[in-house]
Amino acid sequence: MIGVLLPYVRKFQRSAESNDIADRFSYQYTSTLLGFSAIMMAASQYVGRPIQCWVPAQFTRTWEKYAETYCFIKGTYFLPGAFASEGEMSVTSPDDAVTATPQVGYYQWIPIVLVLQAFLFYLPSIIWRTFNESCELKIKELAAVSEASRKIKSNMSDDQVKATKFGRYFFKKLNFRNESPVFKETGSVVASGKFLPALYLLVKILYLANIVLQFWILTYFLETKSWMWGWQTFQDLMAGREWETTGIFPRVTMCDFSIMDLTSVHDHSIQCVIVINMLAEKVYVFFWFWLLFVGLLTVCSLAYWAVIYMLQSVGRNFIYSYLQQTPEFQTEQERGSFVPANFVDKCLTPDGVFISRLVQQNSGDLFTSIMLGEMFSLYRAREAEKAHKKDDDSALPASAPVDLQEDDDDDTPFPPPTKAVAETLTSDDEEEETDVDSPDTTATLPR
């Protein structure tokens, strides 16, 4: 089934054509953005020095490296107001304040969490592409054909040929799905013609649920007090309040550790600079606003497709607006054969209307109009053929049934043959006589 597309379809490199712009912002653009950010953060951790600590003078280089590694793995804590003025600490005893100060232990996990967030954005797309493959109308292949046609813009006739071919293929798939006894007998949701839009709405809801989950991840992972921390951080930056006051993404923190020798245990409190937080602040503040934008776009897209799915008249008007531009539809209007409602409801079904909208969004109005015009012509030709066949069947005379069962009563004669049967028998006898009079001279008779 898919192989018929290969002669005129280029390799399908991305599934962007099987959804709308809101989906692409989620699974494609946002996932790419998060993946790139994860690479940058991982490089700053494992290639550079993510944390640098001020250790006592008696520490050797090995001790210093141990202290920095320990503090990076264990985590540090921030002293509010301790570094507000020229590095003069307002807290004289970190040991007394450590239990009341916020711990900073998220920077070690930033690359891993970013990768997880990127996967969550891509997960609804995987679900969409996996389940729509169970439908006879393969969205990926149909979208690939329309995308291939969009890349040829130099010659209008080429566009028309592509749109016409796509319309024929689309109609063929719809007709097979609508007429196939396999789908009718099973009574599955695929046969109802509403599978694709229902699945698409479910995927839209998953995209929106992922946005809500992402806000929760940011709030919990960064240990902020409110999910609006992104806006609050932006306001603080505009007002000149830096991390020394707010404590969000602190650059300078404290770390406590102990070193044991042969006779005693020595406790140390050192001051560390978390270099990675400088980059993490920019990444996460930007991502918060990006997440808000994608969330609003997803809500609008979900509302748009929900209205289209629930109001059948909206889908009809969409198809009518493109059919009215085609000569095939105008010809039917002139004849008085106005049957677009049957075309939309019986031929396209909600699945076909849904795919037509995706084609329009990715290939343009002209392509969609030519495609629907070709499909409408094929539909009218098919309906005319059905009507003609029905008239022929009704015009045929009903022949009397012949009882071919053996009867023990020899006196009961066979029913007389009908006129058509008698003519057939007469012609057969004439053919036999002709064969006897004119034998085949090339035939070899057995001795």
Curated annotation (Swiss-Prot):
Pfam annotation, one family: Innexin
Annotated transmembrane regions: 30-47, 108-128, 198-218, 283-303
Keyword ATP-binding belongs to the record: no
Disordered: annotated segments: 389-447
Main location: membrane
Compartments (UniProt record): Cell membrane; Cell junction, Gap junction
InterPro entries in alphabetical order: Innexin (IPR000990)
One BP annotation, GO: monoatomic ion transmembrane transport
Chain intervals with Acidic residues compositional bias: 426-438
Keywords on record: Cell junction, Cell membrane, Gap junction, Ion channel, Ion transport, Membrane, Transmembrane, Transmembrane helix, Transport
Signal peptide stretch: none
GO cellular component: gap junction; plasma membrane
Molecular function as annotated in GO: gap junction channel activity; gap junction hemi-channel activity
Membrane topology: Multi-pass membrane protein
Function, as annotated: Structural component of the gap junctions.
Family, as annotated: Belongs to the pannexin family.
Descriptive protein name: Innexin-5
Species per Swiss-Prot/TrEMBL record: Caenorhabditis elegans
